[in-house]
Amino acid sequence: MKADAKTEAAVLAAMNKFTAAYQQRDIEGLMGILSPDEDIFLFGTGIDEKRTGPDEFRFQAERDWAQTETLAFSLAWHKISAAGSVAWVAAEGLGKGKAGGQEFEFPMRMTAVLEQRGDKWLLAQFQISLPAPGQEEGNSVPV
Protein backbone atom coordinates (compact mmCIF):
# COMPACT_ATOMS: atom_id res chain seq x y z
CA MET A 1 0.00 0.00 0.00
CA LYS A 2 1.15 3.53 -0.67
CA ALA A 3 2.87 5.08 2.31
CA ASP A 4 1.15 8.02 3.98
CA ALA A 5 2.86 11.40 3.63
CA LYS A 6 4.55 11.26 7.05
CA THR A 7 5.98 7.77 6.45
CA GLU A 8 7.06 8.62 2.92
CA ALA A 9 8.91 11.72 4.15
CA ALA A 10 10.65 9.79 6.95
CA VAL A 11 11.69 6.92 4.65
CA LEU A 12 12.91 9.31 1.95
CA ALA A 13 14.90 11.19 4.61
CA ALA A 14 16.53 7.89 5.65
CA MET A 15 17.39 7.08 2.03
CA ASN A 16 18.85 10.57 1.53
CA LYS A 17 20.89 10.15 4.71
CA PHE A 18 22.15 6.82 3.36
CA THR A 19 23.19 8.27 -0.02
CA ALA A 20 24.84 11.30 1.66
CA ALA A 21 26.84 9.09 4.05
CA TYR A 22 27.88 6.89 1.12
CA GLN A 23 28.95 9.87 -1.00
CA GLN A 24 30.88 11.40 1.93
CA ARG A 25 32.51 8.02 2.65
CA ASP A 26 31.23 8.24 6.21
CA ILE A 27 31.32 4.60 7.30
CA GLU A 28 29.90 5.25 10.77
CA GLY A 29 27.08 7.36 9.33
CA LEU A 30 26.37 4.63 6.79
CA MET A 31 26.37 1.86 9.38
CA GLY A 32 24.04 3.92 11.60
CA ILE A 33 21.34 3.73 8.93
CA LEU A 34 21.54 -0.07 8.67
CA SER A 35 19.66 -2.56 10.77
CA PRO A 36 22.15 -4.15 13.18
CA ASP A 37 20.67 -7.60 12.47
CA GLU A 38 22.91 -10.27 10.97
CA ASP A 39 20.40 -11.01 8.20
CA ILE A 40 20.51 -7.60 6.50
CA PHE A 41 21.22 -8.15 2.83
CA LEU A 42 22.75 -6.31 -0.13
CA PHE A 43 22.88 -7.15 -3.83
CA GLY A 44 25.32 -4.84 -5.63
CA THR A 45 26.04 -4.51 -9.33
CA GLY A 46 29.11 -6.76 -9.37
CA ILE A 47 28.78 -10.50 -9.98
CA ASP A 48 30.28 -11.19 -6.53
CA GLU A 49 28.36 -8.49 -4.65
CA LYS A 50 26.03 -10.57 -2.49
CA ARG A 51 26.47 -9.43 1.11
CA THR A 52 24.81 -10.59 4.34
CA GLY A 53 25.20 -8.86 7.69
CA PRO A 54 26.65 -5.54 8.81
CA ASP A 55 30.29 -6.67 8.50
CA GLU A 56 29.88 -7.67 4.85
CA PHE A 57 27.97 -4.45 4.13
CA ARG A 58 30.87 -2.47 5.65
CA PHE A 59 33.34 -4.51 3.56
CA GLN A 60 31.40 -3.68 0.38
CA ALA A 61 31.26 0.06 1.07
CA GLU A 62 34.97 0.17 1.90
CA ARG A 63 35.79 -1.82 -1.26
CA ASP A 64 33.69 0.56 -3.37
CA TRP A 65 35.53 3.53 -1.91
CA ALA A 66 38.96 1.93 -2.33
CA GLN A 67 38.28 1.43 -6.04
CA THR A 68 36.98 4.96 -6.72
CA GLU A 69 38.03 8.53 -6.10
CA THR A 70 34.39 9.68 -5.98
CA LEU A 71 31.08 7.85 -6.15
CA ALA A 72 27.61 9.29 -5.65
CA PHE A 73 23.99 8.48 -6.42
CA SER A 74 21.09 10.82 -7.01
CA LEU A 75 17.51 9.58 -7.10
CA ALA A 76 15.31 11.08 -9.82
CA TRP A 77 12.18 8.97 -9.23
CA HIS A 78 10.92 6.93 -6.31
CA LYS A 79 7.90 4.98 -5.10
CA ILE A 80 7.49 4.26 -1.39
CA SER A 81 5.00 1.80 0.08
CA ALA A 82 4.53 0.71 3.69
CA ALA A 83 2.62 -1.55 6.04
CA GLY A 84 3.07 -0.95 9.75
CA SER A 85 6.74 -0.74 10.66
CA VAL A 86 8.01 -1.96 7.26
CA ALA A 87 8.50 0.16 4.14
CA TRP A 88 9.79 -0.72 0.70
CA VAL A 89 11.27 1.60 -1.87
CA ALA A 90 11.76 1.43 -5.62
CA ALA A 91 13.84 4.20 -7.17
CA GLU A 92 15.89 5.10 -10.19
CA GLY A 93 18.43 7.76 -10.80
CA LEU A 94 22.00 8.39 -11.79
CA GLY A 95 25.30 7.19 -10.40
CA LYS A 96 28.37 9.35 -10.98
CA GLY A 97 31.96 8.89 -10.01
CA LYS A 98 35.61 8.85 -10.83
CA ALA A 99 37.93 5.83 -10.89
CA GLY A 100 41.51 5.65 -12.13
CA GLY A 101 41.27 9.31 -13.08
CA GLN A 102 38.34 8.64 -15.41
CA GLU A 103 34.90 10.11 -14.77
CA PHE A 104 31.86 7.92 -15.39
CA GLU A 105 28.11 7.95 -14.98
CA PHE A 106 25.47 5.27 -15.26
CA PRO A 107 21.71 4.89 -14.94
CA MET A 108 20.82 2.93 -11.82
CA ARG A 109 17.86 1.28 -10.21
CA MET A 110 17.46 0.54 -6.55
CA THR A 111 15.09 -1.28 -4.26
CA ALA A 112 15.22 -1.26 -0.48
CA VAL A 113 13.32 -2.55 2.52
CA LEU A 114 13.41 -0.51 5.71
CA GLU A 115 12.14 -1.27 9.20
CA GLN A 116 11.04 1.36 11.69
CA ARG A 117 12.63 0.93 15.09
CA GLY A 118 11.59 3.61 17.51
CA ASP A 119 11.79 6.87 15.59
CA LYS A 120 14.37 5.63 13.04
CA TRP A 121 13.93 3.89 9.70
CA LEU A 122 16.76 1.38 9.17
CA LEU A 123 17.78 -0.40 5.97
CA ALA A 124 17.24 -4.15 6.18
CA GLN A 125 17.62 -5.08 2.50
CA PHE A 126 19.15 -3.17 -0.40
CA GLN A 127 19.66 -3.88 -4.09
CA ILE A 128 21.19 -1.72 -6.78
CA SER A 129 21.22 -2.63 -10.46
CA LEU A 130 21.97 -1.25 -13.89
CA PRO A 131 19.61 -1.58 -16.85
CA ALA A 132 20.96 -4.25 -19.22
CA PRO A 133 23.36 -2.73 -21.76
CA GLY A 134 22.24 -3.23 -25.33
CA GLN A 135 18.61 -3.78 -24.38
CA GLU A 136 16.64 -1.25 -26.36
CA GLU A 137 13.51 0.38 -25.00
CA GLY A 138 10.47 -1.76 -25.78
CA ASN A 139 12.45 -5.03 -25.70
CA SER A 140 12.02 -7.45 -22.81
CA VAL A 141 15.43 -9.12 -23.19
CA PRO A 142 18.89 -7.80 -24.15
CA VAL A 143 19.24 -9.61 -27.49
Locations of regions flagged by a protein language model:
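Short, low-complexity N-terminal intrinsically disordered segments enriched in polar/charged residues
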Residues: 1-36, 141-143
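A solvent-exposed, acidic/Ser-Thr-rich amphipathic alpha-helical stretch
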Residues: 9, 27-82
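Residue-level preference for beta-strand/loop junctions
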Residues: 69-72, 85, 89, 106
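Hydrophobic/aromatic beta-strand elements that line small-molecule binding cavities or substrate pockets
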Residues: 61, 75-80, 93-95, 109-115, ...
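Short beta-strand edge/turn micro-motifs at domain boundaries
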Residues: 88, 105-137
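Short, well-ordered beta-strand segments in beta-rich or mixed alpha/beta enzyme
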Residues: 30, 43-45, 87-97
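Short, cysteine-centered beta-strand-loop-beta hairpins and adjacent loop/turn segments enriched
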Residues: 67-68, 96-104
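Residue-level signal for tight coil/turn positions that link beta-strands
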Residues: 77, 84-86, 118
